[in-house]
C-alpha cells in the first residue's frame, strides 16, 4: 500500500479513528534573537493548548536532535532516533501523519528524518494547524500519547549531505546546491544571517516561501512547483543538495521536489550554521 506524501484536511478528518495512524504535532517556535539570529523554543505549550485529536507532540530540538553537536537540530544517530521514535509509538506497521503550526517546514523536517532512516509510511498535512483550525475541525486538549512501539532505523546516507560533500559540490557541474532562505538572505543584504552574510558559492536560491501559498500555508500546485524549480535549473541536476540556516527550511524544498518525483534529494544538515562557523569555507554575496 502506498502512502501519499501530502494529505489534506478532509483526508485526515475521515481517518482519525484508524488505529494504524500516528499523528504528530512537530511545531517549534523561532523567536528573533540579536545574538543567535533565532532562538528555538519548544512548541509543546501550543500543543497543550490544542491539537488535532489523537496527535502526540514531537520535540524536534530535544528528543530528535543530537544535543552534543553544538548546532541546533542536528540529526541524531540511528540508534538515538530509533529509540526516540519507538518511545513516541511509531513502528513499521504504522502510518505517520505530520503537521506543524507557523510553517510546514517543521513537519517536513521530521518527514525527511524519517525517510533518511528508511521509513516511508509518512505523510505531511497540507496547510498544517492553521488550515485545520481555520476550517473549524475538531481540536483536542488531552495530553495524547501512543503506546511504545518498535522502530528500526535503516539509514539512507545519500539523503544526508556533509560539509565536505557540499564543498566539493561548489565546483561540480552535475550537482545543484539550493539555498532555501529568502532572497535577501541569499544575496547577503539581510541583517538576519548565520555568522557571515551570503550564500555557499555556486548555489541557486529557491526560497521555501516561494513554494507555498502564504495565505493558506499549503503547497502550491505541482505545475507551479515545477515551474519554480525548473527555472532555477534544479530539476535537471544529477544530484540536488538543499540547505538553509539550520537544516529546516531546506527540508521543505526537498519535500517539494519529492512531490515532483525527486526522492533522492539530500539535505545539508549543518547548513549555514555549520558552514559560516568555519572561516576556511567560502561565502559569496550578490
Pin down the residues of each PLM region.
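Cytosolic catalytic domains that perform sulfur/thiol-centered chemistry
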Residues: 1-286
Amino acid at each position: 500500500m502506498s502512502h501519499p506524501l501530502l494529505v489534506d484536511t478532509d483526508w485526515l478528518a475521515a481517518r482519525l479513528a484508524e488505529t494504524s495512524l500516528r499523528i504528530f504535532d512537530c511545531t517549534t517556535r523561532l523567536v528573533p534573537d540579536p545574538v543567535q539570529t533565532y532562538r528555538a523554543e519548544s512548541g509543546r505549550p501550543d500543543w497543550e493548548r490544542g491539537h488535532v485529536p489523537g496527535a502526540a507532540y514531537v520535540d524536534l530540538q530535544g528528543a530528535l536532535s543530537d544535543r552534543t553537536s553544538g548546532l541546533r537540530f542536528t540529526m541524531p544517530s540511528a540508534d538515538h532516533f530509533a529509540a526516540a521514535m519507538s518511545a513516541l509509538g511509531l513502528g513499521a506497521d504504522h502510518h505517520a501523519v505530520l503537521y506543524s503550526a507557523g510553517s510546514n517546514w517543521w513537519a517536513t523536517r521530521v518527514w525527511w528524518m524519517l525517510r533518511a532512516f528508511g521509513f516511508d509510511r509518512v505523510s505531511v498535512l497540507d496547510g498544517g494547524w492553521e488550515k485545520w483550525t481555520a476550517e473549524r475541525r475538531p481540536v483536542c486538549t488531552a495530553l495524547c500519547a501512543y503506546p511504545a512501539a518498535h522502530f528500526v532505523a535503516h539509514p539512507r546516507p545519500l539523503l544526508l549531505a556533509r560539509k565536505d560533500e557540499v564543498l566539493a559540490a561548489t565546483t561540480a557541474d552535475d550537482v545543484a546546491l539550493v539555498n532555501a532562505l529568502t532572497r535577501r538572505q541569499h544575496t547577503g543584504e539581510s541583517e538576519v544571517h548565520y555568522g557571515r552574510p551570503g550564500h555557499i558559492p555556486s548555489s541557486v536560491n529557491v526560497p521555501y516561501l516561494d513554494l507555498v501559498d502564504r495565505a493558506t500555508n499549503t503547497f502550491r500546485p505541482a505545475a507551479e512547483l515545477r515551474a519554480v524549480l525548473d527555472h532555477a535549473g534544479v530539476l535537471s541536476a544529477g544530484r540536488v543538495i538543499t540547505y538553509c540556516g539550520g537544516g529546516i527550511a531546506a527540508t521543505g524544498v526537498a519535500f517539494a521536489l519529492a512531490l515532483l518525483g525527486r526522492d533522492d534529494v539530500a539535505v545539508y544538515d549543518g547548513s549555514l550554521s555549520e558552514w559560516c562557523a568555519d572561516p576556511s569555507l567560502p561565502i559569496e554575496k550578490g
